[in-house]
Curated annotation (Swiss-Prot):
Transmembrane segments: none annotated. This is Threonine--tRNA ligase. Its EC number is 6.1.1.3. One of its GO terms (cellular component) is cytosol.
Length: 648
C-alpha cells in the first residue's frame, strides 16, 4: 500500500498508509485526542473523521475546544436531527435542503399544513430525545442509480432533483443519523450525543420557494440557532429580544420614516422624517469624498444591453436585472435596455472620455448611484434588502504601484466615517486569489501584497480568506459591530483586472506606451438604505442630534404660550436646527410621551413662566427631569451639538 505524508500544525510530519482516516490519525497521536476529536481540517477543507485520506497534505484534528469547526458541525448535525424529528412526527412531510448559516441553520420542508409554534415545541422535544439516544452517525458513498432508486422508493422528489444536479464524477455521499438518512457532503459528528442538548433553539418558520425560484413550490423553512453551551445560547436569545425591540421596520413606523407597499415591492417610500436622515447622511458623505479628492459624477439608470454584454454582466447577472424594452421610432426591433444593477461599467465610460495620462492617475470617480436588482420576494427585509437602492459607490483608476496608497487612504476614510457614525469596531477580511481567475500571477502577487501592506502599515488586525477573492482581483471586506454585538458587512475594497480590459480603459504611461489601469471598486456604507437601517437599529431610533430628523419639538403647556412657541421654532430654524411646534390642546405629559415614542431628542416645554422669562424648559430623550435655559443660550448649545462631526 502506498504511503502519504501528513503535516501537523506544529510542523511535524508523519507517514501513513493511503486511505487512512482522520480518526486513525488522531488515535496514532494520543488516545485522549481520539476520544475528543470531532473532525479534521485537511489543506483547509473541513472533513469528518471517517473520510479516507488519499493524498499527502496538512492536517489538523479538531475538538470541541475549536469553536469554529465545532459550531459548524453542531449546527450541521442539528439540521439533520431536526429533519429526522420532523419526519418521525409527520411521516408524509418531504425534505429538501438544510444548510448551516450564521448562528444556526435552517431546513426547508414540503408540508400541506403550516407549522405552528406548538409544532416547533414538539420538534425540539423530539430532537432532544434523538440527542439523548446517542445514535451513531455513519456515511457511505453510493452510485447514482442506487441513490435514485432509494429516493424514488421513499417518494422524495426534491432529493431526486438534488441528486440530478450533482456533477458526473462527484461522489454521492449519504449520511445516517441513527436509521434516518440524508444526501449530504458532510462533515458530521460521530454520534448524536455530541450535540449539546441545552444549547439550541428553534426560532421561527418562514416561507421559501424551492431553490429560491418563485415559479417553484413554496416550502416551509424552519430556522434554528445553536451554540456550544447554554450560556452562549442564552446570551444570543437575549440579543434577539433586544434586536426585536430595535427592529428598524417597527421604529420606522413609530418615527414615520418610510414605508413599503405591494405596488412597488422592495422599493422605499421615504417620508419627510426618513428622507431627512437620508439627505443628512448623503451630505456628510459628499463632504468626506470632496475632502478625499473624489470627483462626483452622475450616470444613467437605463443602459442598453450592449454595454452589459461588453462588461459581462448580461451573461452573469441577467436574471437579477430589470429589463426595459423600448419601441424606437423607425427601428425594426425593440431596443433592449436594463436598469443598472451596478455602477462600474458606466464609470468606465466616463473614464474613457478623453485619453488619460499617468499624470491623471489616480482618478477617483464617485457616485451616489441608483441601482436596481431583482431580489426574490421572500428574501426582502425592510431597508436591509431591497430592489431599488443607492450605493455610495466610487471607482479609483490607478497604476499597479498606486494600489497600496489608495487602499491605505480608503481604510483611513472608512475608519473615520464609521467612528463619526458611532461604530468604533470593525473587522477586516482579505480574500485572496481563487483557482479560476484573470490576470497574471505577477499582478495578483502585487495586488495582494499591496492590500496586506496597507492594512499592516495602519497596524490593523485582519483575517485572510484564502481563495475567496473574485475571479478579477483580491478584495477586502469590512464588518462593523453594532451596539448589541451584531456584525454587518458594509465596506468593500476590490481590485479589478478584468473590467478595464473588457471595456478598453487605457492610459499613456511614462514610457509613452498605452497601459491598462487597475480599477478599484470601493464603498464605505454599501447602500444608503441598508446603512440607515443599521443606524436605526444601532441607536434604537435615538439618533445623534445631527442625524435626527426632528431635532427639537417646542410644545406649549398652555394656549397662552402659543405665540412664543412659534417664535422659538422660528429662532431654532434660523439657527439651522430642524424644529417643529406642537400647540395642540393636549396635556404636556401626553405631548412629551408621544414625541418620546417618535424618538425626538429634545423637547422644549413652554408655559407662561417661560414666556415671561424668554426661556425654555428642555427635556432630553431618556433623561429624567428638565432644565431651564435662556432661549439664546439653549439655541447656541443645541446648534453646537447638532453640528455634523466632520464640521466640528
Amino acid at each position: 500500500m502506498s504511503q502519504i505524508s501528513l503535516t501537523f500544525p506544529d510542523g511535524n510530519a508523519r507517514d501513513y498508509p493511503a486511505g487512512v482516516t482522520a480518526a486513525e490519525v488522531a488515535a496514532s497521536i494520543a488516545p485522549s485526542l481520539a476520544k475528543n476529536a470531532i473532525s479534521a481540517s485537511l489543506d483547509g477543507q473541513h472533513i469528518d473523521l471517517q473520510w479516507p485520506i488519499a493524498a499527502s497534505g496538512r492536517i489538523a484534528i479538531n475538538t470541541m475546544k475549536d469553536s469554529e469547526p465545532a459550531l459548524e458541525l453542531i449546527r450541521h448535525d442539528l439540521a439533520h436531527i431536526m429533519a429526522r424529528a420532523v419526519q418521525e412526527l409527520w411521516p408524509d412531510v418531504k425534505v429538501t435542503i438544510g444548510p448551516v448559516r450564521d448562528q444556526g441553520w435552517f431546513y426547508d420542508f414540503d408540508r400541506a399544513e403550516p407549522f405552528t409554534p406548538e409544532d416547533l415545541g414538539a420538534i425540539e422535544q423530539r430532537m432532544k430525545q434523538i440527542i439523548a439516544a446517542r445514535d451513531p452517525v455513519r456515511t457511505e458513498v453510493w452510485d447514482r442509480d442506487r441513490a435514485r432508486a432509494h429516493y424514488e422508493a421513499q417518494g422524495e422528489p426534491f432529493k431526486i432533483e438534488l441528486l440530478d444536479r450533482i456533477p458526473e464524477g462527484e461522489p454521492i455521499r449519504m449520511y445516517w443519523h441513527g436509521d434516518w438518512q440524508d444526501l449530504c457532503r458532510g462533515p458530521h459528528l460521530q454520534h448524536t450525543g455530541q450535540v449539546p442538548a441545552d444549547a439550541f433553539k428553534l426560532t421561527h418558520v418562514a416561507g421559501a420557494y424551492w431553490l429560491g425560484d418563485a415559479s417553484r413550490p413554496m416550502l416551509q423553512r424552519i430556522y434554528g440557532v445553536a451554540f456550544r453551551n447554554r450560556d452562549d445560547l442564552k446570551a444570543h436569545l437575549t440579543m434577539l429580544e433586544e434586536a426585536a425591540k430595535r427592529d428598524h421596520r417597527k421604529l420606522g413606523r413609530e418615527m414615520e420614516l418610510f414605508h413599503f407597499q405591494e405596488e412597488a415591492p422592495g422599493m422605499v417610500f421615504w417620508h419627510p422624517n426618513g428622507w431627512s436622515i437620508y439627505r443628512e447622511l448623503e451630505a456628510y458623505m459628499r463632504r468626506r469624498l470632496i475632502r478625499a479628492d473624489y470627483k462626483e459624477i452622475k450616470t444613467p439608470q437605463v443602459v442598453d444591453r450592449i454595454l452589459w454584454e461588453k462588461s459581462g454582466h448580461w451573461e452573469a447577472y441577467r436574471e437579477n436585472m430589470f429589463i426595459v424594452e423600448v419601441d424606437e421610432e423607425g427601428a425594426k426591433e425593440k431596443r433592449i435596455n436594463a436598469l443598472k444593477p451596478m455602477n462600474c461599467p458606466c464609470h468606465v465610460q466616463v473614464y474613457n472620455q478623453g485619453l488619460k495620462s499617468y499624470r491623471d492617475l489616480p482618478l477617483r470617480l464617485a457616485e451616489f448611484g441608483s441601482c436596481h436588482r431583482y431580489e426574490p420576494s421572500g428574501s426582502m427585509h425592510g431597508l436591509m434588502r431591497v430592489r431599488g437602492f443607492v450605493q455610495d459607490d466610487a471607482h479609483i483608476f490607478c497604476t499597479e504601484d498606486q494600489i497600496e496608497a489608495e487602499c491605505a487612504g480608503f481604510i483611513g476614510l472608512l475608519s473615520s466615517v464609521y467612528k463619526d457614525l458611532g461604530f468604533e469596531k470593525f473587522d477586516i477580511k482579505l480574500s485572496t486569489r481563487p483557482d479560476v481567475r484573470v490576470g497574471s500571477d505577477e499582478i495578483w502577487d502585487k495586488a495582494e501584497a499591496a492590500l496586506k501592506g496597507a492594512i499592516e502599515h495602519l497596524d490593523l488586525p485582519y483575517e485572510v480568506n484564502p481563495g475567496d477573492g473574485a475571479f478579477y482581483g483580491p478584495k477586502l471586506d469590512f464588518k462593523l459591530t453594532d451596539a448589541i454585538g451584531r456584525e454587518w458587512q458594509c465596506g468593500t475594497f476590490q481590485c479589478d483586472f478584468n473590467l478595464p480590459q473588457r471595456l478598453e480603459a487605457e492610459y499613456v504611461g511614462e514610457d509613452g506606451a498605452k497601459h491598462m489601469p487597475v480599477m478599484l471598486h470601493r464603498a464605505v456604507l454599501g447602500s444608503f438604505e441598508r446603512f440607515i437601517g443599521i443606524l436605526i437599529e444601532n441607536y434604537s431610533g435615538k439618533l445623534p442630534l445631527w442625524l435626527a430628523p426632528r431635532q427639537v419639538v417646542v410644545a406649549s403647556i398652555v394656549s397662552g404660550a402659543d405665540d412664543y412657541v412659534h417664535e422659538v421654532v422660528a429662532a431654532l430654524r434660523a439657527a439651522g436646527l430642524r424644529a417643529e411646534a406642537d400647540t395642540r390642546n393636549e396635556k404636556i405629559n401626553y405631548k412629551v410621551r408621544e414625541h418620546s415614542v417618535g424618538k425626538v431628542p429634545v423637547i422644549m416645554a413652554v408655559g407662561l413662566k417661560e414666556v415671561e422669562e424668554r426661556s425654555v424648559s428642555i427635556r432630553r430623550l431618556d433623561r429624567q427631569g428638565s432644565e431651564s435655559h435662556g432661549l439664546e443660550s439653549a439655541i447656541a448649545t443645541l446648534r453646537a451639538e447638532a453640528t455634523p462631526p466632520d464640521l466640528r
